Amino acid sequence: ARRGSPLAVGYGHEENYLGSDSYALKSMTNKITYLDDGDICVLSNNKVEFYNSKNIKINKEVLTLSDDKHTTDKGDHKDFMSKEINEQHVTAQTCIKEYVDQLRQDINLYHFPIEPKDITKIILIGCGTAYHSCVTAKYWFEELTNIPVEIDIASEFRYRKLKFDNKNLYVFVSQSGETADTYAALDLCKKNNVKTCAIVNVVESSIARTSDFVLPIHAGPEIGVASTKAFIGQMLVLYLLVLKMSEVRKEIS
């Protein structure tokens, strides 16, 4: 059963698996189902059944994981840290390729959940490295979009006396997309019907699936504890978001 922490089911041939996320299961299967909070899973080697918190049987979507050119193998590197440092430029190139239309010379954010002209405040929320990327992005947003910005450590966000406003944009930054405090802050925002955006590395994660809008950082698996390429990806995606919002608001041309 899932309560708080993430949980996923992987499907195999005459065997099924439980794991925290797609990275934990990807070496065994590319077919997975994510449980929502309160879901119950009855698992055997050839059968998987799901129930909600009221013990009613439910159907869950089976996702097919895409092939990822990034692997959890060290390759020729002595450790994951050096490997991931050397992959930083790949993350930057992938982000630019994904979000920047070179022919039109435009930044494509697809279906953004709120008109940038209508945003009165941006709230950036994260923990650890993600929080530090938010601290830097605050200066960019205020300088280039002329929108006031607040930053919150996710673990503190829920304990403030908050006034939610549907003209505010709440941006949640997380490498894994499963950071417990960040997810709890997002859940509070969803209960108050405000617009949310996730900047994550794992597009199938709880934070990504719960948010109104997702901007993946395309860093691939990051095994090293000290964030390297994921931090670069977060910073770059935040900067592209700043540039696009500035353009739409006619703060820059």
Feature roles, as predicted:
Residues K117-E251:
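Glycine-rich phosphate-binding loops that contact phosphosugars or nucleotide phosphates
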Residues A1-P116, A130, Y139, E143-T145, ...:
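N-terminal segments that mediate ammonia production and transfer
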